[in-house]
Regions:
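Periplasmic solute-binding protein
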Residues: 101-108, 128-165, 192-211, 293-300, ...
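Glycine-centered hinge/linker elements that transmit conformational signals in sensory
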Residues: 178-179, 212-243
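C-terminal capping/gating helix-and-loop segments adjacent to ligand/active sites or protein-protein/ligand interfaces
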Residues: 335, 339, 349-391
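Hinge/lid segment of periplasmic solute-binding proteins
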Residues: 97-149, 183, 278-280, 346-350, ...
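Extracytoplasmic "Venus flytrap"/periplasmic binding protein-like
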Residues: 57, 62-124, 159-161, 250, ...
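Conserved N-terminal structural module of periplasmic/extracytoplasmic solute-binding proteins
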Residues: 1-102, 164, 284-287, 308-309, ...
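Periplasmic-binding protein-like
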Residues: 315-338
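A structural signal for short loop-to-beta-strand junctions that line the ligand-binding cleft
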Residues: 82, 90-91, 119-156, 185-192, ...
Length: 391
């Protein structure tokens, strides 16, 4: 009897071993059949928390594709340069319009212009597509649009008896409003940041229609207008008055009545602002109310060995359901027209004038970038240092 039990136990062990071996071989076989594609992106912690589940859902819907996600939170483009230089670039690359020309001009990105059947470009804002073109060819499918609006603290307006701005205001009305709101050193009328993105609206609304060059007349005139907010009218905080505080921090502290910035601050202001606030478009200059329009999206490496799978991933990430989930974060203005006009963007939270982000698209212009755009901006930052700090 004992002998039979031992035989049965041995048979059971052998049987289980065979089954486990078979499962192991099946798993190895399945993994070998999968195509692995690499995808790189920058992004805040909150963005990545949304992105990672999207990638898992993609893998679930596409069991033959595995996504190797490369999150590069800092020095993204320096690392991307190195990856291309060493022929180890990802298959799918998150990119913005300011850096896209560098890679597109070098022939490193796949031309997606002829892929309308896959991506249905009519579903996206035309200007978001224009921003991601280089020399007439489309090199990325857009995720979002980035433009600038003026955030304003309604409590400060109420305190000093100043009417809220309307979307038809001009630069003279803007100056008049900012002067009334300025009560130094406690409160300044308008923000001042020395990064080019924040003074481009002042240049473009007064006639600049090309890449900014310091010695160009239109650029220089616009820069003088901007510098005057500090030096001439003193309605914006000078460097020593802001000290180590950012403009966003000053706005939250109630020290700025108006702050020129982008959609990316909405989640922060929703969470941290202890006052009522809203947004309005940039005032009209001699050329109208014109702010730069930037865009981010997904490009595909020309050297990718898995282009069909890479296109599948880009199609999924840029799809209606993916963009809806990304939009719910409050961080982006979606490039998909339907999503931008949906409950996912108009979510019954501040700002009340959320439609301003969309109306500004109509009057904005894609930032005039070139292959050397970053060098142009670095030169501008050097040359404007003195101009912006005249007391």
């Amino acid at each position: 009897m004992m002998y039979k039990k031992i035989i049965l136990l041995i048979c059971l062990i052998i049987g289980l071993s065979v089954i486990l071996y078979g499962l192991k071989q099946y798993r190895y076989s399945t993994d070998e059949q999968k195509v692995t594609i690499q995808f790189s992106s920058w992004g805040s912690e909150s963005e990545i928390k949304i992105l990672k589940p999207l990638l898992l859902d993609f893998e679930h819907d596409n069991p033959d594709i595995k996504v190797d996600f490369m999150h590069i939170p800092q020095n993204y483009f320096q690392k991307l340069h190195l990856l291309f230089a060493s022929n180890t670039a990802p298959d799918v690359i998150f990119i913005n319009n300011q850096y896209l020309p560098v890679y597109a001009n070098a022939g490193l990105f796949e031309d997606l212009s002829g892929e309308d059947e896959i991506f249905h470009f009519k579903d996206f804002y035309t200007k978001s597509l224009d921003a991601l073109r280089w020399q007439g060819k489309l090199y990325a499918v857009p995720r979002d649009i980035s433009n600038l609006v003026i955030y304003y603290n309604k409590n400060i307006f109420d305190r000093y008896g100043v009417s809220y701005p309307d979307n038809d205001w001009d630069y003279e009305k803007f100056l008049e409003t900012a002067k009334k709101l300025t009560h130094r050193p406690e409160v300044f009328g308008i923000s001042f940041e020395e990064e080019p993105i924040f003074y481009l609206p002042y240049l473009m609304s007064f006639g600049l229609d090309k890449e900014p060059v310091f010695d160009d007349i239109a650029t220089h005139e616009g820069l003088k207008i901007y510098a005057g907010l500090r030096s001439k009218y003193h309605i914006a905080p000078r460097r020593e008055e802001a000290a180590s505080a950012t403009m966003a921090q000053m706005f939250l502290q109630g020290r700025l009545a108006m702050h020129l910035s982008g959609r990316w601050l909405v989640p922060k202001y929703r969470q941290e602002a202890k006052f009522d606030w809203d947004i309005i478009n940039f005032p009209k200059g001699t050329a109208g109310s014109v702010v730069p329009l930037d865009a981010s999206g997904w490009a595909i490496s020309k050297a990718s060995k898995h282009k069909p799978q890479a296109k599948q991933l880009v199609k999924y990430l840029s799809s209606k359901q993916s963009i809806e989930r990304l939009t719910q974060s409050g961080l982006i203005v979606p490039a998909r027209i339907e999503t931008a006009n949906s409950k996912y963007f108009f979510d019954n939270q501040q700002p009340n004038n959320a439609d301003t982000f969309l109306s500004v698209i109509e009057t904005s212009r894609p930032t005039p970038v070139t292959v050397n755009y970053r060098e142009v901006l670095d030169t501008l930052k050097t040359k404007t240092e003195k101009l912006f700090n005249l007391n």
